[in-house]
């Protein structure tokens, strides 16, 4: 356990007006704060109603006080929580009062969670889950974040790490004792155990990818020529009139954003200005912003007005658009206005892109598009027992998988035990970065400073 010598204070509840506001204090002087503000020692882990006083004994507020001595607290240190009235002025007066006590400072963003991590109250993935739970934008995301906080993700990682450790011991024993009559590397155990670890890792990667989608969502840009129905599609997907829709080409001049959920999957929809030769400076800026959004998208919905062309292949519809589209960008062709053309609604493939025929105006075919977007991201929607994951987690899992693949190739091709042992060690290190067992101070700083103050 790493007990800090300084004591920190911050408001744990969100800033602004509320019925209740909570001040959190953590560190060796938490008990001194209770004596100074309340005037007496508090019984550990009991809620006590008391007045909160300034240095002159004048009452600032009154509320509930709770004291948690180390190590049985959120941070693993002595912790005091003062639950008062949630007005910003009241909270500010209480914090200023506490800061007048020597040896107490304002907490940095995420410092309470950081201390909990450093004091082994939780691992790094669990600490990150606190922020994810607070930021959850759907019920499904909240459940996944809570699972991570309860250790579902960490337990899977720890199981993989333990398996790697046992396999490393076996492989290194085979290297260190070559005089043994049994060829440990050729007896099939190492190969079988390694394949089992790879299979389990791939299963965790699949779950983690779902968790990352749940956290970060999918950025979809609707692009195409003016008056193709882009704004109508934005309204149809979001279920509200976010964008102005008229028969006048070029009505949308700037980027419009809407955030929705499809069976729990966050979807960031972006409607852009119609792409054409700009008629004025305002339109030119809007078109450039449209291309900027396209460059950052996970997928582009290429809108086509079905009443203007019978073509379905984007190479025939607008080759210049494809030429400027970023390489490897996922694209779906949307033939709009099926209510006017009489085309059959549905999904099919034209060369590589998927083609969807729909009517953004009537909403026919839009459900097929929603299901298509889930499939594009590999989102199952079934997150019972799932966990939240971040991009850094996916990167660590990917690196671990790469090194296990290299080790497997060396084992099967050359019986290279030394190289296999090294690849196992590196894979173990990458997995341990997820829970924080092997993590640089720089990474810890970047993770915890992204938290709210008071968390």
UniProtKB/Swiss-Prot annotation:
<comment type="similarity">
    <text>Belongs to the TRAFAC class TrmE-Era-EngA-EngB-Septin-like GTPase superfamily. TrmE GTPase family.</text>
</comment>
<dbReference type="InterPro" id="IPR031168">
    <property type="entry name" value="G_TrmE"/>
</dbReference>
<dbReference type="Pfam" id="PF12631">
    <property type="entry name" value="MnmE_helical"/>
</dbReference>
<feature type="binding site">
    <location>
        <position position="24"/>
    </location>
    <ligand>
        <name>(6S)-5-formyl-5,6,7,8-tetrahydrofolate</name>
    </ligand>
</feature>
<feature type="binding site">
    <location>
        <position position="455"/>
    </location>
    <ligand>
        <name>(6S)-5-formyl-5,6,7,8-tetrahydrofolate</name>
    </ligand>
</feature>
<keyword id="KW-0819">tRNA processing</keyword>
<comment type="subunit">
    <text>Homodimer. Heterotetramer of two MnmE and two MnmG subunits.</text>
</comment>
<dbReference type="InterPro" id="IPR005225">
    <property type="entry name" value="Small_GTP-bd"/>
</dbReference>
<feature type="binding site">
    <location>
        <position position="246"/>
    </location>
    <ligand>
        <name>K(+)</name>
    </ligand>
</feature>
<feature type="binding site">
    <location>
        <position position="252"/>
    </location>
    <ligand>
        <name>Mg(2+)</name>
    </ligand>
</feature>
<keyword id="KW-0378">Hydrolase</keyword>
<dbReference type="Pfam" id="PF01926">
    <property type="entry name" value="MMR_HSR1"/>
</dbReference>
<dbReference type="InterPro" id="IPR006073">
    <property type="entry name" value="GTP-bd"/>
</dbReference>
<keyword id="KW-0963">Cytoplasm</keyword>
<dbReference type="GO" id="GO:0030488">
    <property type="term" value="P:tRNA methylation"/>
</dbReference>
<dbReference type="GO" id="GO:0002098">
    <property type="term" value="P:tRNA wobble uridine modification"/>
</dbReference>
<feature type="binding site">
    <location>
        <begin position="246"/>
        <end position="252"/>
    </location>
    <ligand>
        <name>GTP</name>
    </ligand>
</feature>
<dbReference type="Pfam" id="PF10396">
    <property type="entry name" value="TrmE_N"/>
</dbReference>
<dbReference type="InterPro" id="IPR027266">
    <property type="entry name" value="TrmE/GcvT_dom1"/>
</dbReference>
<comment type="function">
    <text>Exhibits a very high intrinsic GTPase hydrolysis rate. Involved in the addition of a carboxymethylaminomethyl (cmnm) group at the wobble position (U34) of certain tRNAs, forming tRNA-cmnm(5)s(2)U34.</text>
</comment>
<protein>
    <recommendedName>
        <fullName>tRNA modification GTPase MnmE</fullName>
        <ecNumber>3.6.-.-</ecNumber>
    </recommendedName>
</protein>
<feature type="binding site">
    <location>
        <position position="227"/>
    </location>
    <ligand>
        <name>K(+)</name>
    </ligand>
</feature>
<dbReference type="GO" id="GO:0046872">
    <property type="term" value="F:metal ion binding"/>
</dbReference>
<dbReference type="InterPro" id="IPR025867">
    <property type="entry name" value="MnmE_helical"/>
</dbReference>
<feature type="binding site">
    <location>
        <begin position="271"/>
        <end position="274"/>
    </location>
    <ligand>
        <name>GTP</name>
    </ligand>
</feature>
<feature type="binding site">
    <location>
        <position position="81"/>
    </location>
    <ligand>
        <name>(6S)-5-formyl-5,6,7,8-tetrahydrofolate</name>
    </ligand>
</feature>
<dbReference type="InterPro" id="IPR027417">
    <property type="entry name" value="P-loop_NTPase"/>
</dbReference>
<keyword id="KW-0547">Nucleotide-binding</keyword>
<dbReference type="InterPro" id="IPR018948">
    <property type="entry name" value="GTP-bd_TrmE_N"/>
</dbReference>
<dbReference type="InterPro" id="IPR027368">
    <property type="entry name" value="MnmE_dom2"/>
</dbReference>
<dbReference type="GO" id="GO:0003924">
    <property type="term" value="F:GTPase activity"/>
</dbReference>
<dbReference type="InterPro" id="IPR004520">
    <property type="entry name" value="GTPase_MnmE"/>
</dbReference>
<keyword id="KW-0479">Metal-binding</keyword>
<keyword id="KW-0630">Potassium</keyword>
<feature type="binding site">
    <location>
        <position position="251"/>
    </location>
    <ligand>
        <name>K(+)</name>
    </ligand>
</feature>
<feature type="binding site">
    <location>
        <begin position="336"/>
        <end position="339"/>
    </location>
    <ligand>
        <name>GTP</name>
    </ligand>
</feature>
<feature type="binding site">
    <location>
        <position position="248"/>
    </location>
    <ligand>
        <name>K(+)</name>
    </ligand>
</feature>
<feature type="binding site">
    <location>
        <begin position="227"/>
        <end position="232"/>
    </location>
    <ligand>
        <name>GTP</name>
    </ligand>
</feature>
<feature type="domain" description="TrmE-type G">
    <location>
        <begin position="217"/>
        <end position="378"/>
    </location>
</feature>
<feature type="binding site">
    <location>
        <position position="121"/>
    </location>
    <ligand>
        <name>(6S)-5-formyl-5,6,7,8-tetrahydrofolate</name>
    </ligand>
</feature>
<dbReference type="GO" id="GO:0005829">
    <property type="term" value="C:cytosol"/>
</dbReference>
<keyword id="KW-0342">GTP-binding</keyword>
